[in-house]
Amino acid sequence: MDKKEEENLIKRINELTKISRERELTPDELEERKKLRSAFLENFRAGFRQQLEDTVVIDKDGKEVTSEKAKEAQRRKGLRKD
């Protein structure tokens, strides 16, 4: 999902939230809100996972202490040679 799509998604979620404060949402609006929220969370989680998988952790002594799970993900992406 690109930046513009995400902005539109958030805008529509916020519109539905505003409407819900003024009146009850229709069944169609409730379903739309549910789908939009699900899409937003899926995109957020994917971005967060990407960020975590690309992170290298170094302790105060300069030794890498990245988790094995993260190292494996980095190897699959071709970011690590070891």
From Swiss-Prot:
Pfam families, per the entry: DUF896 (PF05979)
Subcellular compartments: Cytoplasm
Source taxon at top rank: Bacteria
SUPFAM superfamilies cross-referenced by the UniProt entry: YnzC-like (SSF158221)
InterPro entries (alphabetical): DUF896
Classification via Gene3D superfamilies: Helix hairpin bin (1.10.287.540)
Keywords, ordered alphabetically: Cytoplasm
Stretches assigned to coiled coil: none
PANTHER family to which the protein is assigned, alphabetical: UPF0291 PROTEIN CBO2609/CLC_2481 (PTHR37300), UPF0291 PROTEIN YNZC (PTHR37300:SF1)
Name the record gives this protein: UPF0291 protein LJ_1507
Protein's organism: Lactobacillus johnsonii (strain CNCM I-12250 / La1 / NCC 533)
